[in-house]
Structure formats: structure tokens, C-alpha cells
A protein has these predicted regions:
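Calycin-type beta-barrel ligand-binding domains and close structural analogs
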Residues: 31-39, 45-52, 81-312
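Short, solvent-exposed loop/hinge segments that bridge or flank secondary-structure elements
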Residues: 23, 27-34, 39-78
């Protein structure tokens, strides 16, 4: 009898084992995660700030860089890669100050080579899928780490491309070009940015000034150094506002661990130079922040009060 039961159990478990025909490979699963992580706006504002604060030699400093990734089709993404060649503290940033390239990334599990393959193709702002008919300009093989994916190897002519180094839910690191002219192998460290909308009221609440009220809006920026400027109607003041989610690379006092913050700066261009009127800081993951100086109020938010759900 016990042999009969054993035979039945073997038969049942064998059937269960053989029934797993829908299992994917782990690289096919990783392909889905990478395709979920990739879209977004990324900026290395934080890296540039701490290069300056840490007095990194000029020849080793990274340029300001922003990368925008959007899904075109399943597993196919457009890449707008922009270097900002001017300093926001010296002049307003214009399109002439930007050097932009375009690419298309195709994401595909490579079970044979045990990785997720990123094929990167040069493109233009039209992002025509005809650009990916031939061989890729650069190929990066991504494998999974503890909390991120990293490039095991790359091939092709990857200089001048968005040569992905690591990718997580919160960041995109890009390998330094060999002919960049910058004397460092440290990658470009771009943090994912969140979109915000802002407005400015002049005067602000309890302003106490005899000026006609005006709201300047809307302005769309992000929280990785996103900036907008206004010229006020009556006093002709050139006000600048900047939103930064600070990812501290250092501690700002000996013996303490400095926690990340969200900072909203209120600044101004004057005949005497660039000045900071003030700033506020709070927890890094908040979705709205504001300052009221009375003579001026600025508010930035991810969701407008126009669309907020009423509550008690």
C-alpha cells in the first residue's frame, strides 16, 4: 500500500513540476523592471553643486547635464540628453546655452548572455523608428545588483552616447566619455527629478504694500535644480526661484549625519550682482512647498489645489 501511495505522490509532484511552462527567465523579468525604471527626467545638479562646494579642481568637474527618457513603444525609449554650458548664477539659461543630442534605446532580455541588453541608436528630435533598423551604435549589457542594475560591459562607439552605467528607481548614472576633456573617471550621477508647478504672488499674504496684486503663473520646473524667473511689473525686479531636493554627499557639521532636504530658493539678479533673498527647507519627499516674505509669496506643488480631493 505504501508503495502505491508513494507512486501517486511522485506522479502528482512530477505533474506540478512539469506544469511550470509559463515561467520566464530572470532576465525577462529584469527587462520589465528596467523598462519601468527608465522613463523620467534626470539631472546631475546635485553632483555639480557638491563639485563646487568641495572645491573639486576645474579640470575634474562634471558639466551640468539633464536627460529626459520617454517611452515610444513597449521597451523602446527616446532619450534627450542635454549639457548646460552656462552658469545660472551668471545669466539666464537660454536654448543657445544648451548642447543636446538624441538617441533611441531598445531594451531586450538576452538569455544567452545572461543580461538585459540595451541597444542605443543615434537619432534626432523626430525619434523615427527607422533609426533602429540597423546595428546599434552602442550596446550595454545590464545585470542586477542589490538595489540597482549596473553595466557589466559595453561595446560599440559609446562615446557621445547616453552610455548607461547604473540604473535604479531614483537615479541614472552615465559613463564618462573617453574624449570628454574632463580628467575623471567618475560617472555622471543624475538623480531622478519630480515635476512641480509654481506661482508667485506680489504682494504676498499680509504684504502691507500699496501695489496692485498680481499672480505670475504657471511655471513648470523639477526638483533637481529646476529654475524659473520673472520680471515684476511695477518694480521691475528680476526674481529667480530654484527648487532642489538635496542628496547630501557630505555632512555639514563634524560628528553629525546630515539628512537630505528639499530647498526652495528665492533669489534675484540685481545691478550689484546675484543675491539670495532667502530660502526654506523641509523633508525631501514633500509634494508642496512655499515661502511668504509678505512683499512676495512663491508656492510650488506637484498637485494643484484645483484638483485636490476635499477632506474634513
Amino acid at each position: 500500500m505504501k508503495y502505491f501511495l508513494a507512486a501517486i505522490l511522485v506522479s502528482v509532484f512530477s505533474s506540478i513540476s512539469l506544469a511550470q511552462g509559463e515561467d520566464s527567465t530572470k532576465y525577462e523579468r529584469d527587462e520589465m523592471i528596467i523598462s519601468e525604471f527608465l522613463p523620467g527626467i534626470y539631472s546631475n545638479y546635485n553632483q555639480v553643486y557638491f563639485n563646487n562646494r568641495g572645491k573639486v579642481p576645474d579640470e575634474e568637474r562634471h558639466l551640468r547635464r539633464e536627460i529626459e527618457v520617454q517611452e515610444i513603444e513597449t521597451n523602446i525609449f527616446s532619450v534627450k540628453d542635454t549639457f548646460v554650458m552656462a552658469n545660472i548664477f551668471e545669466k539666464p539659461i537660454t536654448e543657445d546655452d544648451k548642447k543636446t543630442s538624441h538617441a533611441i534605446i531598445n531594451v531586450e532580455a538576452n538569455n544567452k548572455d545572461k543580461a538585459v541588453q540595451l541597444d542605443i541608436y543615434k537619432s534626432d528630435e523626430s525619434y523615427s523608428l527607422n533609426d533602429i533598423d540597423g546595428s546599434p551604435d552602442c550596446t550595454v549589457m545590464m545585470i542586477r545588483g542589490a538595489e540597482e542594475f549596473y553595466a557589466r560591459e559595453s561595446s560599440g562607439d559609446c562615446d557621445g552616447m547616453t552610455n548607461v552605467y547604473t540604473l535604479s528607481k531614483k537615479h541614472l548614472f552615465v559613463r564618462m566619455d573617453k574624449d570628454s576633456g574632463i580628467n575623471t573617471k567618475e560617472p555622471y550621477k543624475l538623480n531622478e527629478a519630480r515635476p512641480f508647478q509654481c506661482y508667485v504672488d506680489i504682494p504676498g499674504v499680509s504684504g502691507g504694500r500699496d501695489l496692485p496684486y498680481k499672480r505670475y503663473e504657471p511655471f513648470y520646473i523639477h526638483d533637481q535644480g529646476g529654475t524659473f524667473e520673472i520680471l515684476t511689473d511695477h518694480e521691475k525686479r528680476n526674481l529667480v526661484f530654484r527648487l532642489v531636493r538635496v542628496d547630501w554627499e557630505i555632512n555639514n557639521h563634524i560628528g553629525v549625519f546630515t539628512r537630505d532636504v528639499m530647498v526652495l530658493y528665492a533669489e534675484e539678479r540685481t545691478d550689484e550682482g546675484y543675491k539670495i533673498n532667502g530660502y526654506t527647507f523641509t523633508e525631501p519627499d514633500i509634494t508642496r512647498v512655499g515661502i511668504n516674505f509678505k512683499w512676495m509669496l512663491v508656492s510650488c506643488f506637484m498637485e494643484s489645489n484645483k484638483f485636490a480631493t476635499p477632506f474634513m
